[in-house]
Amino acid sequence: MDVIDHRIKAYRFVAYAAVGFSVVAVLSVCVTLPIVYNYVHYVRKSLHKEASLCKISTNSVWDDVTVLRLAHFGNRTARQAITSSEENGGCESCCRPGPPGPPGPPGRPGRPGRPGAPGLPGVPGLPPPDGSCEPVSIPPCAECPAGPPGPPGKPGPPGDPGEDGQPGPPGQDGIPGQQGTKGPPGPPGIPGKPGESGEVGEDAECEPVAPGDQGPPGEPGPEGPPGEPGLQGPVGMPGQVGQKGESGSDGQLDFDGSPGRPGPPGPPGRPGEPGICPKYCAIDGGIFFEDGTRR
């Protein structure tokens, strides 16, 4: 029995431990699943935002590359013209230009050349012999008018949802509805407190009353429940002895019963008869009586 009790205790401990670990595991899953879901949602939102910013940056770089391809650089002729004017002198009094030549025949329109690369900075001009010339100030470049607006760009990615706005003002009260039908009567109310006792009335005047005629007898009432048992009566006189019955049949043989208890000691026996002198006494203590017997 002790071994079985120990086994039952061990199995009970193992069962309780398994149930406890299962409950802890279920609670852990219930707690960690929402956290993991929120983290995955946050990472997904961050990646989407970073991808949108990267896409916007890529589109901006591509637009800049397109603008650089379409830009026209100034040719080398204008730069050389400015350099030649600087080399010839800074003022008209020192360096006078020659007379204009005859106009040449109009040439054929040339093919549009490719935009050349920007040239190197020109060599500074030589100073005049007397050194009294002031440097010629280069006229500023005329501002070019703004070009036509470019084609509309691609729509950007949808932005993050904005914050919730402030709650609006409460609306106006509606028109009161029509009067409803009469409802069923309500339950009875709580009984009120008992009123104050009234004033003592006046005693009635006693008048002699004459007895009326006897009425007819009423119907018999229903049978009542049985009454409680009465008290025990006195002990009766013993009855007469009955006649002896017939003898019964012999019983079946059975095993002997256990020996009964020892009976009470019997009455004392009669006094013994007077003794007789023996004829011979043996050495071994044997006694022989007159009748030849040994007692």
UniProtKB/Swiss-Prot annotation:
Q: Where is the composition biased (Pro residues)?
A: 97-109, 146-160, 217-228, 261-271
Question: So where does this one cross the membrane?
Answer: none
Keyword flag Isomerase: no
**Database matches in InterPro entries:** Col_cuticle_N, Collagen
Ranges of biased composition (kind: Low complexity): 172-182, 229-244
- What would you give as a GO molecular function for this chain, any one? structural constituent of cuticle
* Annotated SMART domains: Col_cuticle_N
- Annotated segments matching region Disordered: 81-278
Provide this UniProt record's keywords sorted from A to Z. Collagen, Cuticle, Repeat
Q: Name one GO cellular component term.
A: collagen trimer
Q: Keyword Iron-sulfur on this protein?
A: no
Q: Where is this region: Triple-helical region?
A: 98-127, 147-203, 212-277
| Coiled-coil region list | none
Known function: Nematode cuticles are composed largely of collagen-like proteins. The cuticle functions both as an exoskeleton and as a barrier to protect the worm from its environment.
Instruction: Say which family it is in.
Output: Belongs to the cuticular collagen family.
Note from the entry: This protein shows 4 potential triple-helical regions, which contain glycine as every third amino acid.
What name does the UniProt record give this protein? Cuticle collagen 3A3
